[in-house]
From Swiss-Prot:
Main location: membrane
Written domain comment of the UniProt record: Protein missing TPR1 (residues 1-41) forms an N-terminal domain of TPR 2-3 and a C-terminal domain with TPR 4-6 which can move with respect to each other, hinged at D-112.
Key word Cell division present: no
Signal peptide positions on this chain: none
GO cellular component term of the entry, any: magnetosome
UniProt subcellular location: Magnetosome membrane
GO biological process: magnetosome assembly
Naturally occurring in which organism (per UniProt): Paramagnetospirillum magneticum (strain ATCC 700264 / AMB-1)
Subunit structure: Oligomerizes into high molecular weight complexes (at least 560 kDa). Forms round, 20 nm diameter complexes with a central cavity. Interacts with full-length Mms6. Probably binds MamC.
Induction field: Constitutively expressed, levels remain the same over 144 hours of growth (at protein level). Part of the probable 18 gene mamAB operon.
Membrane topology: Peripheral membrane protein
Null allele phenotype: Takes up less Fe(3+) than wild-type cells, is less responsive to magnetic field, cells have 1-5 magnetosomes (compared to 8-14 in wild-type). Cells have chains of empty vesicles. Magnetosomes are slightly further apart than in wild-type. Deletion of genes mamH to mamV (amb0961 to amb0978) gives cells with no magnetosomes and no magnetic response.
Spans through the membrane: none
Name of the encoding gene: mamA
Name of this protein: Magnetosome protein MamA
Length: 217
């Protein structure tokens, strides 16, 4: 079976990546260096695939990230960064259950890792596991109080659990970070409505509509 062009390119990039370092260490000329690089060992290949896969995930190239990170993920020799970015890539490419499992294991392995907790908490909101999302996002919000997305999604989770006063508090903090976000005003209004506080909901509905109309002009 012939290799895909992208596979061949990655191989050539891998060999080129290490060609110069081989030449410097062994005093080879460039022809000899590239010849040596084509016999690159598995450890170097693993490092390259790991770094390249994580880079793909960070850049939003999730399918490419999955292809590379699956080759270096080892459940027995657990690497939190590999598991985190492979988990993100799985979620983004539709393999939500597999991604969530990896993120949960990542948090179990690194319970104080705020980035892992953030990603897992937001994933729980996405899959509507609000009871699991709330404690994680509260912890993350305390560690990173100016993260708009965390504050907003925490409000969404609280609202869906019927904890409307707490949801409004979280939405208002998010609104302080981004005053002109129409979706936050609308979320506050809906939370007020669900408590029967129509007069308090009305100005937020109006503001949301104004912002939406302004954005469409």
């Amino acid at each position: 079976m012939s290799s895909k062009p992208s596979d061949i390119l990655d191989e050539v990039t891998l060999y080129a990546h290490y060609g110069l370092s081989v030449a410097k260490k062994l005093g080879m000329n460039m022809v000899d260096a590239f010849r040596a690089a084509f016999s690159v060992n598995d450890d170097i290949r693993q490092v390259y695939y790991r770094d390249k896969g994580i880079s793909h995930a960070k850049a939003g190239r999730y399918s490419q990230a999955v292809m590379l990170l699956e080759q270096v993920y080892d459940a027995d020799a657990f690497d939190v960064d590999v598991a985190l970015h492979l988990g993100i890539a799985y979620v983004k490419t539709g393999a939500v259950d597999r991604g969530t499992e990896l993120l949960e294991r990542s948090l179990a392995d690194a319970p104080d890792n705020v980035k892992v907790a953030t990603v897992l908490g937001l994933t729980y909101v996405q899959v509507q596991k609000y009871d699991l999302a709330v404690p994680l996002l509260i912890k993350v919000a305390e560690a990173n109080p100016i993260n708009f997305n965390v504050r907003f999604r925490l409000g969404v989770a609280l609202d869906n659990l019927g904890r409307f006063d707490e949801a409004i508090d979280s939405f208002k903090i998010a609104l302080g970070l981004r005053p002109n976000e129409g979706k936050v005003h609308r979320a506050i209004a809906f939370s007020y409505e669900q408590m029967g506080r129509h007069e308090e909901a009305l100005p937020h509905f109006k503001k949301a509509n104004e912002l939406d109309e302004g954005a469409s002009v």
